[in-house]
Curated annotation (Swiss-Prot):
Co-factor note (free text): Binds 1 Mg(2+) ion per subunit. The magnesium is bound as Mg-PRPP.
Designated gene of the protein: upp
Name of the protein: Uracil phosphoribosyltransferase
Residues that, per the record, bind 5-phospho-alpha-D-ribose 1-diphosphate: 80, 105, 140-148, 209
Needed co-factor(s): Mg(2+)
SUPFAM superfamilies named in the record: PRTase-like
Residues binding GTP: 30-34
Species for this entry: Sulfurisphaera tokodaii (strain DSM 16993 / JCM 10545 / NBRC 100140 / 7) (Sulfolobus tokodaii)
InterPro entries: PRibTrfase_dom (IPR000836), PRTase-like (IPR029057), Upp_A (IPR034331), Ura_phspho_trans (IPR005765)
């Protein structure tokens, strides 16, 4: 299972803005867009390509790269928090088809002091046709207990895409562990792996509720 933690200064700079309680709503939303764009370019480097030859305006032939997988991308947005993140992904991957998944959830308190299990119901999904050539990106800025993501993965896996990318800004150690146990072959891209969950299921140190901070 490829795990990519984007711990470069630019991504950590934007992560720090998101974590700060002093960051206003507009800046928070725009920062999610910026990180989405950066992550989108990282995904481009992981797609399949061919070496081709082109002719320049000076009549000289030059070898280059054609990323043919650009035509086979589906982005799934976990509503509503992923909306700005997906906006950024689309700036890097403008030909992607777009789908959405919306879920309601109820925390179930168990041991260890935080919601270890969660009842999740997918009450809406609109997903374009997916085939064996497609690269599917599932975007959710915060993955805490991973119950929603596991439900989404269950839907997407049945469609047998070429590969699946999970895109987040922060994922908890516990959420990461749950995903790896059930879907060890997915690609996970994140900016930070945070160590804890509180008794409400919030990631610590985290950044609060991404949807509320982005949209009010």
């Amino acid at each position: 299972m490829p795990l990519f933690v984007l711990s470069k200064p630019i991504t950590l700079h934007f992560l720090t803005q998101l974590r700060s309680k002093n960051t206003d709503q507009i800046t928070f939303r725009k920062t999610l867009v910026r990180l989405g764009r950066i992550i989108g370019y990282e995904i481009l480097n992981m797609l399949d390509y061919n070496i081709i030859e082109v002719e320049t305006p000076l009549g000289v032939k030059a070898k280059g790269v054609y990323i043919y997988d650009l035509e086979n991308i589906v982005i799934i947005s976990i509503l509503r928090a992923a909306t700005p993140l997906v906006e950024g992904l689309l700036k890097a991957l403008p030909t992607a088809r777009l789908g959405v998944i919306a879920a309601s959830r109820k925390e179930t308190q168990v041991n260890l002091g935080y919601p270890k299990e969660m009842e999740v119901e997918i009450f809406y999904n609109k997903i374009p046709e997916i085939n064996i050539k497609d690269n599917v990106i599932i975007a959710d800025p915060m993955i805490a207990t991973a119950s929603t993501m596991l439900k989404a993965l269950n839907i997407i896996k049945d469609k047998k895409p070429k590969r699946i990318f999970i895109v987040s800004i922060i994922i908890s150690e516990y959420g990461l562990k749950r995903i790896l146990e059930s879907y060890p072959d997915v690609n996970i891209i994140t900016v930070s792996i945070d160590p804890e969950l509180d008794n409400r299921g919030y990631i610590l140190p985290g950044l609060g509720d991404a949807g509320d901070r982005a949209f009010g």
